[in-house]
Amino acid sequence: MLDTLERNDSTGSAANAEHFDVLIAGAGISGIGSAYHLQQQCSGKSYVVLDMKDTFGGTWETHKYPGVRSDSDLYTFGYRFKPWVGAPIASADEILKYMGEVIEENAIGPNIRYGHRITACKWSSADNRWTVEAIRLADGSKATFTCNFLWMCQGYYDHEKPYTPDWEGVSDYKGLFVHAQLWDPRTDYAGKRILVIGSGATAATVVPAFAEKAAHVTMLQRSPTYFFCSENKNELADRLREIGIDEPTIHRVVRAQIMHDQDVMTKRCQTEPEVVFEELKELVRLFTGKPDFEFAPHFTPKYRVWQQRLAFCPEGDVFRAAVEGKVSVVTDEIDRFTEKGVRTASGEEIEADIIVAATGFRLSVMGDIPFSVDGKAVNWNDTVTYRGMMFTGVPNMAWVMGYFRASWTLRVDMMGDFVCNLLNHMDKMGAKRVDVQLRPEDQGMPLSPWIEADNFNPGYLMRGLDKLPKRGDKPEWRHNQDYWAEKDQIPATDLTGAEFKYS
């Protein structure tokens, strides 16, 4: 059983607050991984994990649309400490099973409080602690916690309010209109005409899944996306199993292989994007068996490969469905919704029984929770990030922000090491507080938005840059997207450096 702790008091007042050394916000892939590292590396510290849902899983529990699966391989998306045994691309149910095993095997469950929505985080310099206010969703009562260190692992997008453009005429449409993020799994779509708006990772997942039962699926995209087609297996892992190698060794070796290949791929996308695109097209031809497969205009993006995430396409399923006539693609702008469907800018009307918006999500910085330091509200856009983990002017807090191109969880493990090293260092010093601060040589450093648009520019980030902290022009003051650089830099961090201020 994954038991939760129960609180004795019901007033929710600060006087009755429960105190923990560390409070972890979120019981998704980041929060569970962080809890594991805290238990292993800071075994004497008390902690609690708060999550608004009634179970663990985060994204993988929230998303219910057909075919929901990872868009990263599970050898690298899985934790480094627990081997992944299975196909590289996994379903949400398989990922939840994996996470549940981590919770059970490491007795994390008793430290998780489900059904708690955090409403405020307040730092007091007088007390050197955070006060975290929450609401118990079961009955609406208030709960208050205090902690020495706050570890934000709640992800970076809004699970309840996805991004939906303000299309004209939506209310005129007589069929079912829903955002993929809010899909009800009880919906019967067999034999229906389905229109999917979007072309990113979500569309790449739902389109072939819908095509299995729907009468027909149309994917309407404003602009094309790059797809990476591959078999859903890892030959090296399969071969090592055949010769009797143990799973921990397989996990370690295959992770290293995949991370190396991803690093090479990322660099090639920057130095020879045209060559990489030709290779991606060749994979489509291979999986469809169509050497004359036509890529223009629907599968020829206008941006460079890897400026946005590649949409993974196991077994070429999207393209095979298109070749089989189950799926059609339209590249156009939406003029307006009509009673029967959507009219495009070019005048074509696409009729559908169900319209699914796969238009991305809305960025949520720190869960959109109000933060304050000594009574002053925190505006994250006024802060400068330390390696995408900590922030100037905000003491005793870390935020897990993973990689965009590589698997998110690689950074969860790395940050777990960093935060635990920091906490242990503070204990040795007898410090109660740590701030990150610009060093003398950083004064006057030019500050820029969180990430360069020329480097990585998905819509959700571009729409939310004004909510995110600033970055500097030095490695310490930016969220580096290069795992291979960070895997050496972050473990070698000098915690006595001038960028850290202890008291």
Residue ranges and their predicted role:
Residues 77-84, 262, 299-304, 396-401, ...:
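Short glycine/proline-rich turn/loop motifs
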Residues 260-271, 303-307, 438-442:
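Charged, low-complexity surface segments at secondary-structure and domain boundaries
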Residues 52, 57-101, 224-282, 286, ...:
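Glycine-rich active-site loop/strand segments that organize a redox cofactor
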